[in-house]
Amino acid sequence: MIEQANQQIEKDVRDILKQVGDDPERAGVLETPQRVAKMYGEVLAYQGETIFKDYKLFETEETDDDQMVMMQDIPFYSMCEHHMLPFFGQVSVAYLPANGQIIGLSKIPRLVDFVSKRLSVQENLTRDIGQILNQILKPYGVAVQVTARHMCVEMRGIKKANSQTHTTFYSGNFKTDRQLRSEFLQLLK
């Protein structure tokens, strides 16, 4: 099935090259259709997948509801579902462990990859990371901040280079406790 999809993408890329006035047999673009098909397989690796399974929970001593676990500046690359252009940036995630459950730290960047390697918008990417962590951990709260640059803003349309978009997700104590939310945001500076 993947091979068939790649062949279709390659055909479509050759057609696009023709439609924009290029020659798909020209030396510089001769292998472009294969490269584009391979690129989509990589950057959209989790397209259509809905269940994140690549994690392990660890038992730890019961913690207070204000003990924050935070991972900051996790890089990501994604594709805008509106224009199929890249958006990229950093994700910071914090959670308040409950019931003696913590997640392996390497699993948080894997979750970011799982959510970002599909067509999306930043608002949904932010929400999905937070909701999945809530489902897995059932913590006292989750906070997610995503800062990203969007090529659909920078290279087309309004063409505003280096502009950044910030989105946040809060649940549990992060949503109800303004001081805790402030502490999370202060740690991001």
UniProtKB/Swiss-Prot annotation:
Pfam family, one: GTP_cyclohydroI
Gene3D superfamilies given in the database record: 1.10.286.10, 3.30.1130.10
UniProtKB keywords: GTP-binding, Hydrolase, Metal-binding, Nucleotide-binding, One-carbon metabolism, Zinc
InterPro entries: GTP-CH-I_C/QueF, GTP-CH-I_N, GTP_CycHdrlase_I, GTP_CycHdrlase_I_CS, GTP_CycHdrlase_I_dom
Domain of life, source organism: Bacteria
Coiled-coil stretches noted in the UniProt entry, renumbered to this chain: none
Reaction(s) catalysed by this chain's protein: GTP + H2O = 7,8-dihydroneopterin 3'-triphosphate + formate + H(+)
Binding positions for Zn(2+) per the UniProt entry: C80, H83, C152
HAMAP family assigned: FolE
Assembly notes: Toroid-shaped homodecamer, composed of two pentamers of five dimers.
PANTHER family assigned to the protein according to its UniProt record, in alphabetical order: GTP CYCLOHYDROLASE 1, GTP CYCLOHYDROLASE I
Family: Belongs to the GTP cyclohydrolase I family.
Protein name stated in the entry: GTP cyclohydrolase 1
Native species: Latilactobacillus sakei subsp. sakei (strain 23K)
